[in-house]
Design a protein with these regions (language model features):
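Bacterial Sec-dependent N-terminal signal peptides
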Residues: 1-25
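Acidic/proline-rich low-complexity IDRs
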Residues: 4-5, 11, 372, 757, ...
Length: 781
């Protein structure tokens, strides 16, 4: 009997051992053992997102495939028998985007609407941005999401790009520095980010089929550089490829972009995923190194299986991609069995959002120190639709399901001001009537497009005499928003509409006749034309799209509670005709909504793919993007890159500029607050290269620093390092980064157009900082 029990026990132990041997567990067994144990279908299940069960992309609601977290953008499949959990990814760049309400519960799941990326870069303060990222990542973790599909570090090539509000700057260094701080802040919570859109996603028109045509130097120096810096400084968990083609090949199918540049040159260790429904060939994406196809389609499953079985796609390549996904999964909270409590500190995060938005606002004009408002200002006449309906952010995946948005009306009231009740009543009655007259959507997909905004109400509807008599001053808000799928129009988005200009001129004329001041607030998604109207108001404050606390932030600055310290992250041209890429960017005036939706579904406008700036876009502006063009070509601008006013004045001491044996430059500058109000200053360092061996801009931003809040009379010495390698330009002929010999002008300036920078000349020796394989050429075989 004892012998029989021993035999039975041995058999049972043996069977258990066989089961365990057949079913290794992720995190317990070596990853290779887990991969070896997977069937072909399981491997495909892992590399294709969770909606791969659907037969068409229309069956999977765009940007809402979350089963584990309702409203999340997508899900990576799990394999239970191998200890692989499903993981969740969700939008977006201004805060987590999930469903705020769920069935069978009264609990809400709102997220903080933080300021958009453009506001973050306008702070020029990486420590502040890190704190925003920390708060944002905290919500990601508390709500059970593993990866936030953000940030986006594409370059603002043209002011009409519909998603510029999601991007950081026209300058690679500023964009990368702020973006890296955001990544590090978010990931400090042990959740992931997805750096996007890799690469050259600089227009929304026909973004899924647009072919970007350009040269490797332009790509590497301007458009890839911010990605490179962020990868090296922050190592985000994931990278998201872009929709567009690059020199004839889909970005998500370019091995030279994803494997050679991203992984081999820059040392990226994480996972690469597609943008939603991006690319044409699943097998080609797998081969290029695009590990995960999102959100997943049934035909991708079929194509990969067929490609493996017929030998077109090797099992070695598939296993490589599976490994990258498994390595990602092992980092996630869900793999580590973190239990989300759905209870983030929303009140604390709102305060973080408020502080960040305030610091990112830019004072463009302040005649005779109209701002901050003097104490005798009590009663305010508030004009403009968006004064009462402030715009927190853009549309599409960059939107956030917030609990509230503080309007300028409420912000002023919170600050103790009285707002004219008759004007308020007129706007509240006007808005629903005007909205009823807006065109009705004809296509259900139009819900994903930027919405229509109602025209400004005529001042004839108001008793302007009473408004002037009963109020101490006037404030006008101009609102402009944008989003995915559509680029902005020149006529009514870059330029102000006739109704908006009439409102500004009418209010200014009426109040100025009575000796009263007028302030304009620009609650806008990006650059707008100002020359034609800016002579009217006494002050102009650029609030951007500041998130849910916007009205409070504006009021803080108007009242002098906070001193504006934001600086422009892009140039504001006098006219759109001055933009260097104007001839090589879509004209949204001619694009129809049905065409836009067709393009998203993979149906290009051009029947032969030959419509300029729609089917293909040539980057003929080269490296002369933004201020690099305006300053080099001496083109006048309305407001230069790096510009911003303050309520105080700062004086700079003589810079101390040194160079070590390796050619690295160090700049020390002492900044003194010479005014009467506490404030922060942004010190900007530009460098002019000799430009003998290669055509170069006259100045390029090579470093910056922001002071702490300096009290009147207080000084601070800031240090700015410029590594030798950061002086290099890309030589296409030899495929190398090289520094030319000669004299370099190191200029400490207040903005890119500063005519009297504090200049020091440093002599550098020639050198090659890196030699790389030729990539991103126009013909890819």
């Amino acid at each position: 009997m004892i012998k029989q029990l021993l035999v039975s026990s041995c058999v049972l132990f043996s069977a258990t051992f066989v089961v365990q041997a057949q079913n290794p567990k992720l995190g317990v067994s070596p990853i290779q053992d887990v991969i070896n144990a997977m069937t072909l279908d399981e491997k495909i299940q892992l590399v294709v997102g969770s909606t791969g069960k659907y037969e068409s992309q229309m069956e999977a609601t765009i940007g809402n495939q979350g089963q584990l977290v309702q409203g999340a953008a997508g899900q990576v499949n799990g394999i239970e028998r191998l200890g692989i959990p499903a993981t969740v990814v969700a939008d977006g760049p201004a805060g987590l985007r999930i469903d705020p309400k769920r069935k069978n519960t009264d609990k809400t799941f709102y997220c903080t609407h933080f300021p958009v990326a453009t506001v973050m870069s306008s702070t020029w303060n990486k420590d502040l941005v890190y704190s925003v990222g920390t708060s944002m990542g905290d919500e990601v973790k508390h709500y059970g999401v593993d990866v936030l599909l953000a940030p986006a570090t594409n370059i603002m090539r043209n002011p009409l790009c519909g998603r510029n509000f999601e991007y950081y700057s026209e300058d690679p260094l500023l964009a990368a520095t702020i973006c890296a701080a955001m990544v590090n802040g978010i990931e400090s919570n042990d959740v992931g980010t997805s750096l996007k859109h890799f690469a050259l996603n600089n227009q929304e028109t026909n973004r899924t089929r647009n072919n970007v045509i350009g040269n490797p130097r332009t790509f590497r120096e301007i458009y890839l550089k911010p990605f490179e810096i962020v990868i090296k400084e922050a190592q985000p968990w994931t990278v998201m490829t872009s929709y567009n083609l690059i020199n004839g090949t889909m970005s998500s199918e370019r091995c030279d972009l994803i494997t050679e540049i991203l992984r081999h040159e820059w040392g990226f260790k994480g996972m690469v995923m597609t943008d939603w429904f991006g690319g044409l060939s699943a097998a080609a994406q797998m081969e290029a190194g695009n590990d995960l196809l999102m959100p997943g389609k049934a035909d991708q499953v079929k194509e990969i299986r067929k490609a493996v079985l017929n030998g077109r796609l090797s099992m070695e390549i598939l296993d490589r991609n599976v490994r990258h996904i498994l390595e990602y999964i092992m980092q996630t909270p869900r793999f580590k069995q973190y239990v989300a409590d759905n209870n983030p500190d929303l009140k604390g995060h709102a305060l973080v959002a408020r502080n960040a938005a305030t610091e990112g606002m830019v004072l463009l004009k302040n005649n005779k120190n109209v701002l901050p408002l003097v104490q005798k200002i009590k009663n305010i006449a508030l004009f403009g639709n968006t004064s009462y309906d402030f715009i927190a952010g853009g549309t599409g995946s960059g939107n956030v399901n917030h609990a509230y948005v503080v309007s300028l009306l409420d912000g002023l009231k919170n600050a103790g001001y009285q707002v004219d009740g008759d004007i308020y009543k007129a706007y509240i009655e006007y808005a629903p009537k005007a909205k009823a007259n807006l065109p009705k959507p004809k296509n259900p997909l139009e819900a994903f497009l930027p919405g229509h905004f109602i025209p400004e109400m005529s001042l004839a509807e108001l008793n302007m005499s009473a408004a002037v008599k009963n109020n101490d001053m006037a404030i006008i808000t101009i609102g402009k928003s944008s989003g995915e799928f559509l680029d902005r129009k020149i006529s009514d988005s870059f330029n102000l509409t006739k109704e908006e200009k009439d409102m500004i001129s009418g209010v200014c004329n009426a109040f100025h006749k009575a000796g009263k001041k007028v302030v304009v607030i620009l609650n806008v998604c990006g650059v707008v034309e100002t020359k034609s109207w800016i002579g009217g108001p006494d002050a102009v404050l650029l609030s951007w799209l500041p998130g849910q606390e916007g009205g409070n932030c504006v009021a803080d600055i108007l009242a002098g509670k906070e001193n504006p310290s934001g600086r422009l992250p892009m140039t504001w041209p006098v006219s759109y005709n001055d933009v260097p890429s104007k001839a090589d960017f879509p004209n949204p005036e001619t694009v129809k909504v049905d065409d836009v939706l067709g393009m998203f579904m993979g149906k290009g406008i051009g029947s032969k793919g030959n419509v300029k700036n729609v089917d293909y876009t040539e980057y003929n502006d080269g490296v002369y993007v933004g201020y690099r063009y305006y300053q080099t070509k001496n083109v006048p601008v309305s407001f230069p890159f790096g510009y911003g006013m303050s309520y105080t004045t700062f004086k700079y001491g003589k810079p101390v500029v040194t160079k070590d044996a390796q050619g690295n430059i160090k700049v020390l500058v002492t900044v003194k607050n010479a005014g009467k109000v506490a404030g922060k200053e942004v010190v900007q360092v530009y460098v002019a290269a000799p430009g003998k061996d290669m055509d170069k801009p006259t100045r390029e931003l090579r470093g910056f620093a922001k002071t702490k809040k300096l009290q009147p009379g207080e000084s601070e010495t800031v240090t700015i390092d410029i590594p030798y390698k950061n002086l290099a330009s890309f030589n296409e002929v030899d495929s190398q980064w090289q520094v030319e010999a000669g004299d370099y002008k190191v200029m400490v300036a207040k903005n890119a157009a500063d005519r009297k920078p504090l200049t020091t000349v440093i002599t550098e020796e020639a050198g090659v900082t890196e030699k790389v394989r030729p990539c991103l050429l126009k013909e890819v075989k």
